[in-house]
Amino acid sequence: MLLSKAQYDEIALFITTLRPTRQCMRRLKERFPCQSQSTLLSIFSQEYQKLIKRTHAKHHTPEAIEMYYARYLNEVARDPTVPILLELANEVDFSPALIARTVLERFLQDHDGQPPTKPILSSMLRDPSLIPDPVLANQVHLCIINDCCNGPLVDGIKHAIGHEHEVLLRQKLKEHNLAFLDEDQLRLKGYDKTPDVILEVPVAVDGHVIHWIESKASFGDEASHNTYLHDQFWSYWNRFGPGLVIYWYGFIEELDCNRERGILLKDGFPESLVTLGSCMAQNAEHGQHTKSRLSETHQETQS
């Protein structure tokens, strides 16, 4: 699904009025019924990540951490059944999963007498039953399952969706009888930074020859696309030549401006692509047709 910059900006502006809850997607879909839910969810997630980056520092000052932890202790002493951390996250307009991580880290520092290691903290967020306090474990669990943009649950879903679309890409290539090397095969050959697939024989898409394809199970906005260009796409271009990027959930159409330089954008697997074999067949057919016409013309001239 392609959006103009103006359409994208309208969606992004509306997202600033929403909080990262499961209900926000219903409001977003009601406001933009013509857009697919997967596209809207991808845009929402990316816009919310930008907000998190902008406000992350103020929620992690020593003063903020102590305030959140004290608030949790006071509220839980009053009524441990209330979703305190979830309500706190909504109140300060920050990610529930990240608020839970902050309070859990502070709790473990009190409990163990020293800050927890990152692996321990991450394992407890993935499996709150490992948290030594059952009340806090439940509070963290509520934050994790109610955060639609951050946390181990969301990370797992994103990873699964990304893998699913990589599998879809490989299936499409096989359906078109296109030989390719995937990331695992390329790493065995010693490549460290590679696209998802490299075509063993280049193909033409919209009149442009491509050597590789990168799958992105996300929406291509300006910020993410420019980051990918800098960190990935131009590196692929330098090493392997021109290629194709598939943003499965759409992109801002104005970003597809590097075709002549060798990077094409699509929002799905190309409907029409031209292989070297089909080119040769077409050329042979054209040559045979031309030869026949010349022969006919010669015979007409002789008669």
Swiss-Prot record:
The source's domain of life comes to Eukaryota
- InterPro entries referenced in this protein's UniProt entry, alphabetically: CDIN1 (IPR029404)
Write out the entry's keywords from A to Z. Cytoplasm, Nucleus
Q: Where in the cell is it found?
A: Nucleus; Cytoplasm
In Pfam terms, one family for this protein is: TPD
Looking at the keywords, is Secreted present?
no
Does the keyword section mention Ribonucleoprotein? no
Q: Which GO terms describe its cellular component?
A: cytoplasm; nucleus
The function of this protein is: May play a role in erythroid cell differentiation.
Know the name of this protein?
A: CDAN1-interacting nuclease 1
